[in-house]
């Protein structure tokens, strides 16, 4: 099931980048998303409605958004991804190039929790590993 979980995470990331609403089928109804401490909003979003609100919030802040997954740690029911994000701030016009790290928790092939971290080491530790 582990590799399947990695594939689910990649499909969610790819679907989000395409703006594909079918991506919600891979996300549990009771999902919790916790923004990383490096992001200005610092919010926690709940359920499909929350995920959709996060997309709206994100698109209000950023344009020309690009994301590349740099590394993936397959941890069974958890997956850690290290991403490179590039975008332009809509209000500031400033081009941003930053690394983010996400810890994804899956149950029955769906994402139930997605939490952002400031560093890869912090996410791996939260997943029960030390880097």
Feature map (PLM): residue ranges:
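Short acidic-aromatic low-complexity motifs
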Residues: 2-30, 130
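A solvent-exposed, acidic/Ser-Thr-rich amphipathic alpha-helical stretch
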Residues: 21, 26-77
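Short, surface-exposed coil-to-beta transition loops
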Residues: 65-67, 95-102
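A short hydrophobic beta-strand element
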Residues: 76-85
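Hydrophobic beta-strand positions in extracellular immunoglobulin-like domains
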Residues: 85-87, 106
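Short, cysteine-centered beta-strand-loop-beta hairpins and adjacent loop/turn segments enriched
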Residues: 87-95
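Short beta-strand edge/turn micro-motifs at domain boundaries
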Residues: 102-125
